[in-house]
Amino acid sequence: MASETASASQWVSPSSRPQHIEQLISGVDRYNPQNLDVLHDYLAQQLDDGSYDLLANLAILKLYQFNPADFNYVVVINILLKALVAAPLPDFNLCISLLGEAPLPTVPVKAEKEATTTDADNAGSLSGDDDDDEVVEKPKDVASAGHLTDPLIVRLSQLSTLLFQARFREFWSTLASESYSDVRDYAAKISEFENAARRVALNSVKGSFTSISEKRIANYLNLSGSQLAEFINAQDGWKLADGTVSVPANPDNEIKATVIREEISLDQMHKFLAQAQSPLLRA
């Protein structure tokens, strides 16, 4: 419970947040578009040093929502990439929800015309009247993130889903695919991006295993050999030896027998037995 409280505290107010940013996003100044440059500089700091501050980044997206003329596509992509590797927290979806009014392409309500017939028209066709077929518009099945169809944002959304669902091998193979080269170009400019994704995998393993094979965790982390050993041994409490990785004990992976003991007083037992008797015996 203490660790969960500490994690929530870091989410609301990370220790890396400067005092002037704390004051800015805690008051009405967060809605002042003149503060965008300050928030942009703070985001650049996060990209450089690997820190992360969701609430400050959400403040940027909120200002874009109120001031579409200030919208900066590159800033949005960087914010989404930082939120992506915060899984399993819902940060990515929170960011997407604030892009609803952004100047980006969206799924059209009616995107494609198809020739279809109504039930009445079908009945007419059976009687030989085929000239009244009505052409109606049907929604097109378009890949989207929320309702946004910007190709890069859709790809980020797909990566976010893979991380959230703990499909780590698929995450790495998708990220390495040719169609995701633009994602890799942006991610390469973010300090510790891949290691942040690896920590998502470690947290998932930490809650489910007491030990795991080296081969399996290598696939989860997209590392092998000395790089894998170096990364694992750098984690507090983790050890790699003889092809097996030992996971540190924590409340989620400890196996404990649960003993439930209920004490019933003699008085309570007397009342229970009295209520269980048939009316005939009570008389």
Swiss-Prot record:
Region called Disordered, residue ranges: 114-135
Listed InterPro entries: ARM-type_fold, CSN8_PSD8_EIF3K, eIF3k, PCI_dom, Transl_init_fac_sub12_N_euk, WH-like_DNA-bd_sf, WH_DNA-bd_sf
UniProt subcellular location: Cytoplasm
GO cellular component, one term: eukaryotic 48S preinitiation complex
Domain PCI: 52-263
Keywords of this entry: Cytoplasm, Initiation factor, Protein biosynthesis
Principal place of residence: cytoplasm
Pfam families with a match to the protein in the record: CSN8_PSD8_EIF3K
GO biological process: formation of cytoplasmic translation initiation complex; regulation of translational initiation
GO molecular function: ribosome binding; RNA binding; translation initiation factor activity
Alphabetical list of PANTHER family matching this protein: EUKARYOTIC TRANSLATION INITIATION FACTOR 3 SUBUNIT 11 (PTHR13022), EUKARYOTIC TRANSLATION INITIATION FACTOR 3 SUBUNIT K (PTHR13022:SF0)
Primary role: Component of the eukaryotic translation initiation factor 3 (eIF-3) complex, which is involved in protein synthesis of a specialized repertoire of mRNAs and, together with other initiation factors, stimulates binding of mRNA and methionyl-tRNAi to the 40S ribosome. The eIF-3 complex specifically targets and initiates translation of a subset of mRNAs involved in cell proliferation.
Protein family according to the UniProt entry: Belongs to the eIF-3 subunit K family.
Subunit and partners: Component of the eukaryotic translation initiation factor 3 (eIF-3) complex.
Record protein name field: Eukaryotic translation initiation factor 3 subunit K
